[in-house]
Amino acid sequence: MRSDAIKRRLYSKAIFIIPFWILSIALWFSSGSVYKIDSCMIDNNKTTCIPYTISKYTDFNSNSQLNQFNSSFILFQIIPINILCFLPLLGYMYILASVLKVDLVKKAFTIFGIMMLITIPLFLIVSICIFPLNLRETLCSDLKNGFIKSNIVDKGNTTICNLKESFNYFKGSFSDTTTTTTTTTTLEWGITYNWYFIIATIVFSFSMLVIVLVLLIKDANTLNNGDGQNYSLFEQENDENFEDDDPNDVIESGLDLWGRNIWYNYTKKPMNSILLSIFQLFYIGSYFSLYYFGFKFNLIPFFINLIILFISYYNLIFDGIRDNYLIKRMYRERSNDVNQFIERVKKIKPKVAIVKKPNKEGGKSSSGGGGGGGGGIDDGIEAILEPRLLKSWLDQSELDYLMINDDDDKYKPIVELTIIEDFKTTSQLPIDAISLLFVKTDLSNYYIITNKKKRFIQINRGLHSFLVLIGLSGLFNILYLKRLILKKSITIKTLFEYNNR
């Protein structure tokens, strides 16, 4: 079934990202220990380290150079590592965009992700190479200016900054030997690195970069199926071609997932997606709460929200896919593809009810046969044929409009396909054919028109894609669809307009 094909394709890509997501969370929890500014006084006659007045990250005078040094170091170390922890989420959204064929969103994620994957290791490498070289000058300047109160008495040339000996890479020391005693006091200071975090972060970043590039190459190789046609999610799955299925079976089996009926009902009930959006806001908030309030009591809600995030995206894919994926395929078509689409629609022969109006002379229509009419309708309709298979493609000259001849469902949406330039006719399809229309056309515009109030609203496909991918499709429903679908008596048309450029 189509849903199974989507799940298999999604899982086959997500398996690359999920382990890195878990690793990134572990890195984020430990990012506070990646580096530290250590300082203490060590008495040669003792084994203990007396804490020096320079503390980790804080207690720096705002005017001191060491404060600026610390801020710059956080910029180059802590922030990139925290950003890195969000990259798997970015990768997961890239996977969704890839599976759902949201090319614009996928390209944006790809560019941003590659930039971050290249930039973060460079930030770490630069910080390792440059910052230790500047620390001595920074510390000495602050000592001379009195911004740092040393526990060691400053006596002439005995201070750190006047020593002629060179400092080692990360730590420096000096001895204060008085004439009356032989006690030597050593001040050690510098940046201490946990190298395994640095190395793990760099390896992690480049590994993610390699995986992204591999996925890009793989997608590029499958974009064309050999005939120059657009790659379709359903064309090949376990060596089976869905297009070879019986057309009627395609329609019937697809209605549970791809049917317009279900999508229509789904858009009228945005509460589920709103709740999922709220949960995801809690998930984002848990990051900040963990950062500011510690890791202990926040661990449980963090992982609960993480699970909710997975569940919400799962539901958004396999519930919201009807109002998301099918729209994503509506562009990049060529004129020959539209022609091929029309030919395929003709083969399906969906059941429709044909409504004929009297001709200008007031006579009866000769094409009103085929199954029992319902003449004498007050609104000027001459006859309504019983539902039957549409055996030929009817253009505007042969048919005024099509509608579902069902008292309970007669106000359901009707799909209208307008093809400009190469195809000058306007044709309408009934609701039964909507699944093929959505899947097989990549037309440029997506509109909703309400006939009752003559409102015309263009839906921004890019905004829709973004809101769905971040779990806020409920917001989209409120902004666009909730105010359109007011009650059942409103007829809604979906207009697809193709411009051959």
Swiss-Prot record:
The chain crosses the membrane at residues 14-34, 73-93, 111-131, 197-217, 274-294, 297-317, 466-486. It is a multi-pass membrane protein. GO terms for cellular component: membrane. It comes from the Eukaryota. The keyword Transmembrane applies. It is found in: Membrane. Keywords: Membrane, Transmembrane, Transmembrane helix. This is Putative uncharacterized transmembrane protein DDB_G0291480. It comes from Dictyostelium discoideum. The lineage of its organism: Eukaryota, Amoebozoa, Evosea, Eumycetozoa, Dictyostelia.
